[in-house]
Amino acid sequence: MKNYVIHDLPDYFKQYKKSIKNPKKFWDKIADENFVWYQRWNKVVKFDMEEAKIEWFKGAKLNITKNCLDRHLNLRGDKTAIIWEPNNPDEEAQHISYKELHERVCKMANVLTELGIKKGDRVCIYLPMIPELAVTMLACAKMGAVHSVIFAGFSASAVATRVNDCEAKMIITSDGSYRGNKAIDLKGIIDEAVEKCPTVEKVLVVKRTNTDIKMKEGRDFLLDDYYPKASTDFVTKIMDAEDPLFILYTSGSTGKPKGMLHTTAGYMVYTAYTFKNVFSYRENDIYWCTADIGWITGHSYILYGPLLNGATTVIFEGVPTYPEPDRFWAVIEKHKVNQFYTAPTAIRSLAKESSEWVEKHDLSSLRVIGSVGEPINDEAWHWYNDHVGKKKSPIVDTWWQTETGGIMISPLPFVTPTKPTYATLPLPGIQPVLMDEKRNEITGNQVDGALCIRFPWPGIARTIWGDHQRYKETYFSAFPGKYFTGDGALRDEVGYYRITGRMDDVIIV
């Protein structure tokens, strides 16, 4: 991200002020200087908050996979793009270079094409955390198919609900997955789900556990039968800025899952920019986010954000407590991880174990540690800061949502002074406001209210797949002219934000 790294606090305030005063100019420059476009946009942003219609970089032509892979081949072809750390520590890790990842993605795109997938088709992906998960997502994006990743822990009925909602033509799954000392029959779950999915024509099966599985003739296809002979050349599809990139379902606390639709250009620009700044990423760093790719954190900060920056990203198949409760710390030491991004749930459960599990590992490579998924409580923050960060690596306590596409409020390492349990300050381009129950904006500090965002940002989801009315009502009706996050927040005496929890049942007087 040329010219857009924030170096210190005065620089943050300067950039932030610029981004609020003239958001169009701010994002125009970032998009122009840091990405490869087939054609430039004729309008930076166009929006109607009442109708919940938002468009960024309208008129632009691009492909996100070209920006994640192809453009790095000259300078970073031999650099490791993905380090895959398997569930079992005795199994060898894979180091996949940008060149090899590009070849794998082209081969996969050719396989999908051979099996009848075209631009605009929806492909559901139900895979464990194996390299093929990243490869299939990037292949879909390269060929213009819309991926919808379903977390490989969901039941057959949860899978069927999501597959039917987006009318997927294909499901990509594996024979099974490993979780700790258990092998799980993923193909069996998909067989049950597909019985209720009339739009699914084909199921593509990746081998992982090599267990015996039933294959239905004419519907089920083994990747191994197609992949070896597939070409490593594939003509990248040229996409419009607002073409769908992926649908990701968020359960939320009420009603059926919402298929959040993210589009190509805005999501690309926002995830790349936020990754670079929030994790203080430098050229040869090793970055590890422990989330599952089935969640938005994995989409934005395991796959797209890091690869857009030419980074090395770790994909971990296992769990934090297998074979012992020091697996996270062992992986950090083994791969000399510089940035580590995990959830408060994991931090709390690992904090219950003896601190000897952490102390026995060399974590000196760590420079930044992060938290995501929910507000981190005071005790967990201090344990993480003291034992993992050794009081040297700043904690980036990030607030964002499936709907926002990328991080919205967060400290920037070595820039923003941290404060336990506070997400601190908004990133450039993000205008948080607190609202009261009478829909009035609450000004000043030491106040709390409903957290809304005043102006659109490039990463915002554009709609709920197939139900724009629900999107409008959920996010834009409670506080007209603003995006309502569904969260409450407080603003302290210096303007730092702390998320106080969900407000889904907010009553407007």
Give residue spans per PLM region:
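Conserved AMP-binding/adenylation subdomain of ANL enzymes
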Residues: 268-286, 296-339, 353
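ANL superfamily adenylate-forming
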Residues: 89-90, 170-241, 353-354
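Conserved ATP-binding/catalytic segment of the ANL
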Residues: 443, 452-509
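N-lobe entry segment of adenylate-forming
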Residues: 1-96, 100-103, 107-110, 189, ...
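Gly/Ser/Thr-rich phosphate-binding loop
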Residues: 308-311, 338-342, 351-420, 431
